[in-house]
Curated annotation (Swiss-Prot):
<comment type="similarity">
    <text>Belongs to the TerC family.</text>
</comment>
<feature type="transmembrane region" description="Helical">
    <location>
        <begin position="42"/>
        <end position="62"/>
    </location>
</feature>
<keyword id="KW-1003">Cell membrane</keyword>
<keyword id="KW-1133">Transmembrane helix</keyword>
<dbReference type="GO" id="GO:0005886">
    <property type="term" value="C:plasma membrane"/>
</dbReference>
<feature type="transmembrane region" description="Helical">
    <location>
        <begin position="67"/>
        <end position="87"/>
    </location>
</feature>
<feature type="transmembrane region" description="Helical">
    <location>
        <begin position="192"/>
        <end position="212"/>
    </location>
</feature>
<keyword id="KW-0472">Membrane</keyword>
<dbReference type="Pfam" id="PF03741">
    <property type="entry name" value="TerC"/>
</dbReference>
<feature type="transmembrane region" description="Helical">
    <location>
        <begin position="159"/>
        <end position="179"/>
    </location>
</feature>
<dbReference type="InterPro" id="IPR005496">
    <property type="entry name" value="Integral_membrane_TerC"/>
</dbReference>
<dbReference type="InterPro" id="IPR022301">
    <property type="entry name" value="Integral_membrane_YjbE"/>
</dbReference>
<feature type="transmembrane region" description="Helical">
    <location>
        <begin position="9"/>
        <end position="29"/>
    </location>
</feature>
<keyword id="KW-0812">Transmembrane</keyword>
<protein>
    <recommendedName>
        <fullName>Uncharacterized membrane protein YjbE</fullName>
    </recommendedName>
</protein>
<feature type="transmembrane region" description="Helical">
    <location>
        <begin position="134"/>
        <end position="154"/>
    </location>
</feature>
<feature type="transmembrane region" description="Helical">
    <location>
        <begin position="107"/>
        <end position="127"/>
    </location>
</feature>
Length: 218
């Protein structure tokens, strides 16, 4: 029994760590323009709100999958988020600090909400009804998310072009969510090329659209 518990725990921790890497990218990108103190607040608050929300999502995992086009809507949101983070201006003096902070937290939480959909289903299955496994797995992933986002922020400061890689990751994840939506499964099964190419095309679309916007704004 203990052996099965440990195996399930390792599986859940692995799932949470994989998602934690994606979360760290989103957190670093969403908070990169904030002053140091507010960035720390955004990282900590955003992480803990997202983790608490994911615990609730895991409890409702089965019901979530029955909502029509939820994954598709989440995928489209991630495309928008990837685009928005690319065109975001660093000069935010006209925005109140508190507004910027809560906007960053909102971005982190919403991105986590949609990016977690697939993972909470996997976690719910791996936990076999042991809710303690869900909580332990998420607690283990928290330091990874927090420290990972700080390291990614440092990398973004040194190599600004990495923002395109981060947005590309969001776009690709969004494209994958769209093609995996249950309501679109029949169409995707009949058009295998679309299923393969769509995530790649969404990356190209988001990056090219942001470059076009920046050229127009000059």
């Amino acid at each position: 029994m203990e052996h099965d518990y440990l195996i399930s725990l390792l599986v859940i921790v692995g799932i949470d760590l994989i998602l934690g890497g994606d979360n760290a990218v989103v957190i670093a990108m969403a908070s990169r323009h904030l002053p140091d103190k507010q960035r720390q607040q955004a990282i900590i608050l955003g992480t803990f709100i997202a983790v608490a929300m994911r615990i609730g999502l895991t409890s409702a995992a089965v019901y979530l999958l029955n909502i029509p086009f939820l994954q598709c809507a989440g995928g489209i949101f991630l495309l928008y988020l990837g685009y928005q983070l690319l065109i975001e201006k660093k000069d935010t003096k006209h925005i109140k600090s508190s507004t910027s902070l809560w906007r960053a937290i909102r971005t982190i939480v919403l991105a986590d909400l949609f990016m977690s959909l697939d993972n909470v289903i996997a976690v719910a299955g791996a936990s076999h009804g042991e809710f303690s496994l869900v909580v332990i797995g998420l607690c283990v992933s928290v330091p990874v998310i927090i420290w990972g986002s700080k390291l990614i922020h440092i990398a973004l400061e040194k190599i600004p072009l990495l923002i395109y890689a981060g947005s590309g990751l969001l776009a690709y994840t969004g494209g994958e969510m769209i093609v995996r939506d249950k309501k679109l499964s029949l169409f995707m099964a009949q058009h295998g090329t679309v299923e393969t190419l769509l995530p790649i095309l969404t990356v190209a679309f988001v990056i090219l659209a942001s470059i076009y916007y920046q050229q127009v704004e000059k």
